[in-house]
Structures are given as structure tokens and as C-alpha cells.
Design a protein with these regions (language model features):
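A short acidic, often aromatic-flanked loop/helix-cap motif at beta-alpha or helix-coil junctions
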Residues: 119-127
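Phosphate-handling DNA/RNA-contact segment within nucleic-acid enzymes
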Residues: 1-83, 102
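Short, acidic/turn-prone active-site loops that include or flank metal/cofactor-
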Residues: 68-72, 93-96, 119-120
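Acidic beta-strand-to-loop metal/phosphate-binding motif
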Residues: 46, 83-97
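Conserved beta-strand scaffold positions in the cores of enzyme catalytic domains, especially
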Residues: 64-66, 113-117
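Short, aromatic/basic amphipathic alpha-helical patches
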Residues: 100-110
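Short, small/acidic-rich helices and loops at N termini and domain boundaries
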Residues: 36-40, 126-147
């Protein structure tokens, strides 16, 4: 049992995301789908939530996983190390929490990986269209994702 996740459709309701009792935030959302791509390209794209993962996969970025929020934990770090990734593309939200998450990820992961934080024009990659994602990210991360 991993758990169930629900999201409020109102931006004013808090918390926005609800997890079932016993939900395992120690996992990386989508790792089971992304693992072959991560191994092949030695690169993982790290985003905050499930919706971000869905949108990135929709845009063709198959090596994307979610951390279930704005911080990474030790269990998730172990999974990242075991994934075969040497590079982490960090696409946390463009807000205070996302900036703190970026710093926390770098601090926790240390020198184990190479890091890239692409610039995006929206607060959240999950709010972008597939065309916007491809327009803004292709030139920034293409070199580390494709031979």
C-alpha cells in the first residue's frame, strides 16, 4: 500500500493536497516509469508534485519524478542515488517555497550530483502548456538529456 492523494480544486483551500493516513512520502512519484530513462541518460528531472510529473511526461520528458512537496527526505535521496542519475534538473516552483526547496535539495544531496535549475516563465511547471514547456526547456536541458 502506497496511499491515496487528493487535491483541492480551490486555490484558497488549505492544505491544497491531502494524503491518506500512512501515505509514504519516502517514495519518488513516477520513478517506476522514469527509471529506464534515468539510467540511460543519467539524468533525473525533479519536480514537486504529481501534476508536474504528469505535465512533464505529456511534454515528452520521461525521466521526471516528483518529491511530494517542497522538500526531499533521506529515503528519496537513497532512491535518487540508486537510480543511476549523475545529473539532477531541479524544477521546483518559482516561489519562496520552491526556492527554499531548491536550496534544501542542493544541501541534502551535496556533491553527489551535478545540478541544473532551468528558468521558466511560470510559477509552476504544471501550469504550463506542453508547447511552453518544450519552448522553454528544450534549449536549456537538451544537452544533458540526449546523446
Amino acid at each position: 500500500y502506497v496511499g491515496c492523494v487528493g487535491r483541492s480544486i480551490s486555490d484558497t483551500m488549505t492544505p491544497k493536497w491531502m494524503h491518506s493516513k500512512g501515505f509514504r512520502k519516502s517514495l519518488l512519484y513516477g520513478l517506476n516509469i522514469a527509471s529506464d530513462h534515468i539510467k540511460k541518460h543519467q539524468t533525473v528531472i525533479l519536480v514537486e508534485g504529481q501534476g508536474d510529473v504528469w505535465r512533464m511526461h505529456e511534454a515528452g520528458y520521461k525521466g521526471c519524478v516528483g518529491i511530494f512537496g517542497s522538500s526531499i527526505n533521506e529515503d528519496q535521496l537513497i532512491l535518487l542515488e540508486a537510480s543511476g542519475a549523475l545529473n539532477i534538473v531541479i524544477l521546483t516552483d518559482e516561489d519562496d517555497a520552491g526556492n527554499k526547496a531548491f536550496q534544501q535539495i542542493i544541501k541534502k544531496c551535496g556533491r553527489r550530483f551535478n545540478y541544473l535549475r532551468p528558468e521558466i516563465s511560470h510559477k509552476d511547471v504544471g501550469d504550463m502548456t506542453v508547447d511552453q514547456i518544450n519552448q522553454e526547456l528544450n534549449h536549456q536541458i537538451k544537452g544533458i538529456l540526449y546523446d
